[in-house]
Every structure is written in structure tokens, then in C-alpha cells.
Design a protein with these regions (language model features):
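Positively charged n-region of N-terminal signal peptides that target proteins for export
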Residues: 1-6
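Residue-identity detector for threonine
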Residues: 7, 94, 102, 126, ...
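Bacterial N-terminal signal peptides
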Residues: 10-19
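N-terminal alpha-helical modules
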Residues: 25-26, 31, 41, 47, ...
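Lipid interaction determinants
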Residues: 25-64, 106-177
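Contiguous, well-ordered beta-strand patches that form the walls/edges
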Residues: 43-44, 67-144, 232-235, 243-247
């Protein structure tokens, strides 16, 4: 497949998606079948209000979205996701126009939203959006003047709009990918570590906990007030949490809940 540098900007009308020009003449439903992982989260760098998501938010990065003929599913999708998705090709549009419509602006408003969000896209480039309609449920949130969309940045990478005026970069996962947590699985010794090393979802959440902890440390240092004591308190809190997590032993549901809650807690502390 020829690689196209296209634009991925979000919006969802009862679950819509937009895909890039390389899919313009193909069966997009077949081309995107498989597992995709959230690689990056983009938020408006000029927004001074308290955000729902932060840049590369650990709540979203690492989450897997499954596309198949009958559904679109994943832990970050609302309820049961999108049932019986269909893909409707839209007219070509520039990245700037697509982002303006998603934000509720006039299509030809002289904004530079691609730059404001730090998106890996060029505002003047043209993309071919595909709307994804769901027989029931939804994929992502609707934009202000356009539905949810997906476009191809390059082969194996998609961009789509998401909740709270954010955007997600999705990367295709190879078949039979091995779990890769934040620690070396060769050294896994406890039931908890072994469970994490045998499950891609748990391994992803383990990476997210590590990422969220790193963000919390950086935030404490950036504020530069009582840094030593706050870092000490954070470390104690993390060690206590690890003990609680290990009480789950190999219970996957318990581990998933513990890690999701910890990620949310650490991210909230960093806002």
C-alpha cells in the first residue's frame, strides 16, 4: 500500500470515522480490520482550562481498539462499542477544514489547529474522510459540525477525533504481539507479575501506571515546592499501592481495575 501523509481529525455523528486517501478507492472496512493501539493523544496546547485529558494521557495511550466486520470494540469505547459498522466515503477536504468543522468553526476559518494540537499533519494537505455509522452503539464522539472520522497518516497509522476535543493516533498491532509491561518478564516471579506478562491488556496498563507515575514526578519537580517531601510521599503511596495490587495475585479483573484506578489517580494529581 502506498504511504500517504494524510490528516486525521476527529468528530462523531452516531459513530463516524474518516480515513485517508489511500483508502479512497478500496474497501476501508477490510483495510482496517485488526487490532490498533493508541500511540498518542493530542490536546489543544492553547487551552488554559483544566483538561479532561492531558497530552499522551496514560488513560488512553496503550489501549487497544479492535476492528472487525461485525463491530468496533475496546475498553475506551462507550458501552459495547459500535455494532455492524459501515463506512461512507466523503468528499476530499483539507486537514485545516476538517479540524475547523470538528471544533465547530467555519470550514474556512483561518486557524492553525493542527499546530495548536501538535498534530503530525499539515493543515493544507487533503484527506478523504470516511464516516463510520453504527447500527447500534458508537465508536467515538461527534464533532460540532461533522461526525467521528478516521484518516490515514501513513501505512499502519490512523488518526481520529476523540472525547473532549482530543485526537488519537492509532497504530496497527502486528499479529501475535507479545505482552510488554514496564518490567522484564524474564524476571517475573510473583503470580501478579506472571499474570501481567501473559496478558497484553494488563501489560499495557502496567506501562500506563509507570508512565503516569513518571508524569506525577515531573509535575512535582516543575512546581518546585516541597519537592523532596512530595516525592517521598509519592514513592510511599506507590509502594503501598503495589502491595495492594499484588493482593490480586493472578486475578486479571482485579489487576485491571487496580491499575486503571491508579492511572486515573496519578493523572488527576498531575493536572
Amino acid at each position: 500500500m502506498k504511504s500517504n501523509k494524510l490528516t486525521f481529525m476527529p468528530a462523531l455523528l452516531s459513530s463516524l470515522m474518516l480515513v485517508s486517501s489511500c483508502y479512497a478507492s478500496g474497501d476501508i472496512g477490510s483495510n482496517i480490520i485488526g487490532q490498533w493501539i493508541v500511540e498518542n493523544v493530542y490536546v489543544d496546547g492553547n487551552d488554559s482550562s483544566r483538561p479532561d485529558f492531558i497530552s499522551n494521557d496514560p488513560n488512553l495511550v496503550g489501549r487497544v481498539i479492535n476492528f472487525d466486520k461485525n463491530s468496533i470494540s475496546g475498553s475506551i469505547l462507550v458501552a459495547n462499542g459500535c455494532a455492524s459498522p459501515s463506512y461512507n466515503k466523503k468528499d476530499p477536504i483539507t486537514v485545516a477544514q476538517l479540524l475547523n468543522l470538528t471544533a465547530g468553526e467555519s470550514e474556512n476559518e483561518k486557524n492553525d489547529l493542527a499546530n495548536d494540537y501538535g498534530l503530525p499533519l499539515v493543515a493544507k494537505n487533503t484527506v478523504v474522510p470516511y464516516e463510520v455509522n453504527c447500527k447500534s452503539g458508537m465508536f467515538g464522539p461527534s464533532g460540532e459540525k461533522i461526525g467521528n472520522w478516521i484518516v490515514e497518516k501513513k501505512d499502519g497509522e490512523l488518526l481520529t477525533n476523540w472525547n473532549s476535543q482530543s485526537y488519537l493516533l492509532l497504530k496497527r498491532l502486528p499479529a501475535n504481539v507479545k505482552p510488554m509491561p514496564s518490567f522484564n518478564c524474564i524476571k517475573a516471579s510473583t503470580d501478579t507479575e506472571k499474570a501481567i506478562c501473559s496478558n497484553n491488556e494488563l501489560a499495557g496498563w502496567d506501562r500506563s501506571v509507570a508512565q503516569a507515575y513518571s508524569i506525577a514526578v515531573k509535575q512535582i519537580k516543575s512546581v518546585d515546592v516541597d519537592v523532596k517531601s512530595k516525592l517521598s510521599m509519592l514513592l510511599v503511596s506507590q509502594n503501598n499501592w503495589i502491595k495492594k495490587r499484588n493482593e490480586c495475585k493472578g486475578d486479571e479483573k482485579c489487576l485491571s481495575e487496580k491499575m486503571q484506578n491508579r492511572v486515573s489517580e496519578l493523572v488527576e494529581q498531575s493536572k
